[in-house]
């Protein structure tokens, strides 16, 4: 298979291309020839919908997998959290690469922690789960939906403060220019009078003029002009200046890995949220590559990309999610972590407003983790998770 080109489908978003690029790099390191094929999905066309709503329909996955099943491409790269627990019969998850940090982060312009956000602060999120977790942890905060990809959401967060600073600097610059004009007119008038006075002490006059200039410079509020200030902004901040969001957000909650992969992690203030209190989405931080079950590319992909530990962890998470039956309809977090002979698995199921919660952390036997995962989910359903999920389905 190494001599045959592998056609790999991906979405065309910045994040998707970066994710696919990681897979391509690994395959090419193994001397495989790879062609990346961009495919537009329903999720790319519907730009005014929340990601949580798009997830209900498999909007980011279906078009890519259709290309695989039709033989147009050999395989497709997905974010594991977007992949439905029921995969078409003709497809197989051929490989699950090493998972990156699955944690969520609180994003603010200045690095404020969740505990320190003032009551009434507006927190934006595109996820039902994240919204419910924030409300459960900090009931006094106002959780609002936010649309767009990773970069768009960050720009919406930064835009209002940047606009205010731009206004402040523009007004100060106008005032300084007006003051300079008045001083110039006053100086011209004084010079006209002094020109007609005999025996004028020229040196004293020049000294006084210099003093006037120093007073004007010292009264300037900003060292930079508005143009110089704008030019000093980062590309992210300059792009944010072009946005005029309907809602002003004080913070966002989003996946750390999305910020990392788009190169934005170090351009904003973040607080990494504990995976114990803010349990991530099933498969968060992981990628997967799907292929036709009968394709000879399956072994090639598995040999080059498979990370066994990640496969076990995300499989345990997906078994719990499938047994719960919530999918993207209800606020559900599931996070599994291999620890020796056990798999520590944390589950949270919330009401949409975060006021009710059913959850548990349990050690699953690595030898029978799928069975244990089903039992964990069944126990949670019996303890009220089923009712929360049904309520969410009714409200959807």
UniProtKB/Swiss-Prot annotation:
Q: Name one GO cellular component term.
A: cytoplasm
The UniProt record lists the EC number as: 2.5.1.61
GO biological process annotations for this chain's record? heme biosynthetic process; protoporphyrinogen IX biosynthetic process
The protein's superkingdom reads: Archaea
In which residue ranges is the amino acid composition biased (Acidic residues)?
200-215
Which keywords appear in this protein's UniProt record, sorted alphabetically?
Porphyrin biosynthesis, Transferase
Q: Where is the composition biased (Basic and acidic residues)?
A: 162-189
Show the coiled coil region(s). none
In the UniProt entry for this protein, what further remark is given in the free-text comments?
A: The porphobilinogen subunits are added to the dipyrromethane group.
The role this protein plays is: Tetrapolymerization of the monopyrrole PBG into the hydroxymethylbilane pre-uroporphyrinogen in several discrete steps.
Protein's name in the database = Probable porphobilinogen deaminase
Gene name of the encoded protein: hemC
